[in-house]
């Protein structure tokens, strides 16, 4: 790649969060790209001899469904910053449009007021065309952009500090090595995950093609299973849910889809849902995890052509979640349904007895309370 490859190492609340890697569009806006490049390297000073650099500065303004803004290394509040050409420099051109998420564009206070501040789009922003200069894009770790985008804010400032701990530029050899490592990991059989968390951010795969989405989801399932066997239930849950997001690009396949493809989607989606539910059940109990299990298993139960054992498993896991939610009536109903599907299952029988005993004890307690009130 002939264009410059730059990076930010990011911390969130002073904890390492990962690296954002950018391609700068030197071929279209060389002056603007050069400004960003040298602010990443930190090898320039202003007339007063003060170092000009992004390292140590923060993202001071983040608006979900719009953009993340940073680059004010002098004041940190959006009123400062300085370019390598002086305090401000002109708009180079508006050839590139804000037609997609993950673009780098210059923040400004009007025409010809570019400094060091920039923003990363998280959605298409065509209303900014002709006003802000697009000069790059995020190429790796777009999931980190989404993570930052979803941090709660106060007056648009992230409640957790999002800091550029270090920044720089990759040499062509370093970038070639990075690409080779990614390709080897993708081609390998070790279950590596190199895909973005959200299908719409992944450029290496066309998730709109069912076959490609299926391949990614299958590999992510392998990663999740590996993590599950290692006892890393939170990580496994994350991988299973990520795999579901790739499958869910196609909630329903076209009517003319091959029967084999339809069955492949069904037979992969089902274990992803039930395995994710199992992972959530193994995490510390909370209203969020139990609600997630109910949601996942309820989805599983809507899938076509479920076998008796598949239906029984989903009902049993949903019943476990209802127990955590203290909804014993719903749990008992699901357990009785599960027992019809898998007669004699020891786990189902035990939990059903426990639930029935709890309901009986509760009814007796209520009876005694009423007796005292009206006795």
Swiss-Prot record:
InterPro entries: Cyclophilin-like_dom_sf, Cyclophilin-type_PPIase_dom, TPR-like_helical_dom_sf
EC numbers, comma separated: 5.2.1.8
Molecular function terms, GO-annotated: cyclosporin A binding; peptidyl-prolyl cis-trans isomerase activity
Class of the enzyme per the UniProt entry, highest EC level: isomerase
Subcellular localization: Cytoplasm
Any single GO BP term: protein folding
GO CC annotations on file: cytoplasm; intracellular membrane-bounded organelle
Annotated catalysed reactions: [protein]-peptidylproline (omega=180) = [protein]-peptidylproline (omega=0)
Pfam families the record matches: Pro_isomerase
Keywords for the protein's UniProt record, in alphabetical order: Cytoplasm, Isomerase, Repeat, Rotamase, TPR repeat
PPIase cyclophilin-type domain mapped to chain residues: 7-169
Transmembrane segments: none
Residues in TPR repeats: 217-250, 270-307, 312-345
Protein family according to the UniProt entry: Belongs to the cyclophilin-type PPIase family. PPIase D subfamily.
Entry function: PPIases accelerate the folding of proteins. It catalyzes the cis-trans isomerization of proline imidic peptide bonds in oligopeptides.
PANTHER family assigned to the protein according to its UniProt record, in alphabetical order: PEPTIDYL-PROLYL CIS-TRANS ISOMERASE, PEPTIDYL-PROLYL CIS-TRANS ISOMERASE D-RELATED
Protein name: Peptidyl-prolyl cis-trans isomerase D
Organism per entry: Cryptococcus neoformans var. neoformans serotype D (strain JEC21 / ATCC MYA-565)
């Amino acid at each position: 790649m002939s264009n410059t490859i730059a990076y930010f190492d990011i911390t969130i609340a002073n904890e390492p969060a990962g690296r954002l890697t950018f391609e700068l569009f030197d071929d279209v806006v060389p002056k603007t790209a050069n400004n960003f490049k040298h602010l990443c390297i930190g090898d320039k000073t202003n007339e007063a001899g003060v170092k000009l650099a992004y390292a140590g500065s923060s993202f001071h303004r983040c608006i979900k469904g719009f953009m993340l803004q940073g680059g004010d290394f002098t004041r940190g509040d959006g009123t400062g910053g300085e370019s390598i050409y002086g305090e401000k420099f002109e708009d180079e051109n508006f050839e590139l449009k804000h037609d997609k998420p993950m673009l780098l564009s210059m923040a400004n206070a009007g025409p010809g007021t570019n400094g060091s501040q920039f923003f990363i789009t998280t959605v298409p922003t065509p209303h900014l065309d002709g006003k802000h200069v697009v000069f790059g894009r995020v190429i790796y770790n777009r999931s980190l952009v989404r993570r930052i985008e979803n941090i709660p804010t106060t007056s648009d400032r992230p409640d957790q500090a999002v800091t550029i701990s270090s920044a720089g530029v990759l040499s062509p050899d370093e970038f070639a090595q990075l690409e080779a490592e990614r390709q080897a990991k993708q081609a390998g059989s070790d279950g590596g995950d190199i895909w973005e968390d959200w299908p719409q951010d992944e450029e290496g795969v066309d998730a709109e093609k069912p076959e490609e989405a299926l391949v990614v989801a299958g590999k992510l399932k392998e990663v999740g299973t590996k993590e599950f066997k290692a006892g890393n239930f939170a990580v496994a849950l994350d991988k299973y849910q990520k795999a579901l997001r790739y499958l869910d690009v196609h909630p329903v396949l076209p009517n003319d889809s091959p029967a084999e493809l339809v069955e492949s989607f069904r037979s992969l989606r089902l274990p992803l849902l039930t395995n994710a539910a199992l992972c959530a059940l193994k995490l510390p109990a909370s209203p969020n995890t139990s609600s997630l299990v109910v949601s996942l298993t309820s989805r599983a139960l809507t899938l076509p052509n479920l076998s008796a054992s598949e239906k029984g498993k989903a009902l049993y896991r949903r019943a476990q979640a209802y127990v955590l939610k203290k909804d014993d009536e719903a749990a008992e109903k699901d357990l009785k349904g599960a027992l019809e599907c898998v007669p004699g299952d020891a786990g189902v029988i035990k939990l059903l007895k426990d639930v029935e005993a709890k309901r009986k004890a509760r009814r007796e307690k209520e009876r005694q309370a009423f007796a005292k009130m009206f006795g």
